[in-house]
């Protein structure tokens, strides 16, 4: 009997912890929405709130016109864990802060450790935006041997023409694969489709006319006024399903 009570208490504690974590992750998502970061789009996986899908659009500088997909992996105890979230690009991206082997972005120069309540995912994404906007400035004051891609750093500082050529190769590759079949069946994976007049034409016309389908009454009534896109959030409410 005692063992059963202990097991129930343990299950209840785990459920409470999960609910609290999901609220915190949802708050992070809402903060990102409110920041309106230009050229960066992210959304949590439909099945796992600790995995996020993202796309970075270069708007200026050496990486202008780039379209780089990436994944964010959150630590199991996020955001209470001091471990840093991991950003991994899905393709080769030449940059002093991106590992050429794992394609992971080194954020430790800006975030030595994760401080719960002080550090937020929107800041992490803002950092990504800044270092791609000015890669040379992003490595000032950092020893070359402490960078993830030493070769990229040396090219950037000593042979910018070659660095730019390598970047352009990355950009070309990213565009060639933008319409590829998704590597996952997760419905929240960000998918791009080629323009189809019969499908996208009416939407484009509404945008040009200053109207959006999302503002039409019928669209709002169909989903309660909100479309979260998150399976672990109750439809029509910002409430994790775990609470039920």
Swiss-Prot record:
Would you say which domain of life the source belongs to? Eukaryota
**Residue ranges of every copy of the UBC core domain listed in the record:** 20-176
Residue ranges of the region described as Disordered: 209-244
InterPro entries, from UniProt? Ub_conjugating_enzyme, UBQ-conjugat_E2_core, UBQ-conjugating_enzyme/RWD
Provide the GO biological process annotations.
defense response to bacterium; sperm individualization
Record Pfam families: UQ_con (PF00179)
List cystine links: none
Q: Which family does it belong to?
A: Belongs to the ubiquitin-conjugating enzyme family. FTS subfamily.
* Full protein name: Protein crossbronx
Q: Which organism is it from?
A: Drosophila sechellia
Lineage per the UniProt record: Eukaryota, Metazoa, Ecdysozoa, Arthropoda, Hexapoda
